[in-house]
């Protein structure tokens, strides 16, 4: 049995978890509501203030989905209570970020500013002009929005200029040595 999958997920106060007969899990909390459909090869039950995930059989796919399903539901519960956030930093001369209403405007060395629309349920905060914080209840969407922002100008291999996650180590290549 999966070591992760067999652990029950405690439901904190103020969080409501519902499981429909077709394996759709709905988690409601202070930070919003999340809903996700899971495959029928796993059984999801709410009992004694905990969510318990079990599997029907023991083949490879069912074993894989057992731990995955438990981890996703645990992230849904954490998301509606605490939320998730991902921080990015902009490195480079003249590179900056600004917020205009619900749009993030990035000036990162292109001939034009790049505009990114804020998605519903995801909050984008600009601190100073070189730090961006993406917040939300859905871990997957927070990570995807942060990855989309980073993709606008990935860190350069020679100077490290671009958009990177806070704490990300960018390995720099050595430049040409040239003739002397």
Swiss-Prot record:
GO terms for molecular function: rRNA binding; structural constituent of ribosome. Keywords: Ribonucleoprotein, Ribosomal protein, RNA-binding, rRNA-binding. The keyword Cytoplasm does not apply. GO terms for cellular component: cytosolic large ribosomal subunit. InterPro entries: Ribosomal_uL6-like, Ribosomal_uL6-like_a/b-dom_sf, Ribosomal_uL6_a/b-dom, Ribosomal_uL6_bac-type. Pfam families: Ribosomal_L6. The keyword Transferase does not apply. GO terms for biological process: cytoplasmic translation. This protein binds to the 23S rRNA, and is important in its secondary structure. It is located near the subunit interface in the base of the L7/L12 stalk, and near the tRNA binding site of the peptidyltransferase center. Part of the 50S ribosomal subunit. Belongs to the universal ribosomal protein uL6 family. This is Large ribosomal subunit protein uL6. It comes from Caldanaerobacter subterraneus subsp. tengcongensis (strain DSM 15242 / JCM 11007 / NBRC 100824 / MB4).
């Amino acid at each position: 049995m999966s070591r992760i999958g067999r652990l029950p997920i405690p439901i904190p106060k103020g969080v409501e978890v519902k499981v429909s007969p077709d394996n759709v899990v709905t988690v409601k909390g202070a930070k919003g509501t999340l809903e996700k459909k899971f495959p029928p090869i796993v059984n999801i039950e709410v009992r004694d203030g905990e969510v318990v995930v079990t599997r029907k059989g023991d083949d490879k796919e069912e074993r894989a989905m057992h731990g995955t399903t438990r981890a996703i539901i645990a992230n849904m519960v954490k998301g509606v209570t605490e939320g998730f956030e991902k921080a990015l930093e902009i490195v480079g001369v003249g590179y900056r970020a600004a917020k205009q209403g619900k749009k993030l405007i990035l000036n990162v060395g292109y001939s034009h500013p790049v505009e990114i629309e804020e998605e519903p349920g995801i909050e984008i905060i600009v601190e100073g002009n070189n730090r961006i914080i993406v917040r939300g209840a859905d871990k997957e969407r927070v990570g995807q929005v942060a990855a989309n922002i980073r993709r606008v100008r990935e860190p350069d291999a020679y100077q490290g200029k671009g958009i990177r996650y806070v704490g990300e180590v960018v390995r720099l290549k050595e430049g040409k040595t040239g003739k002397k």
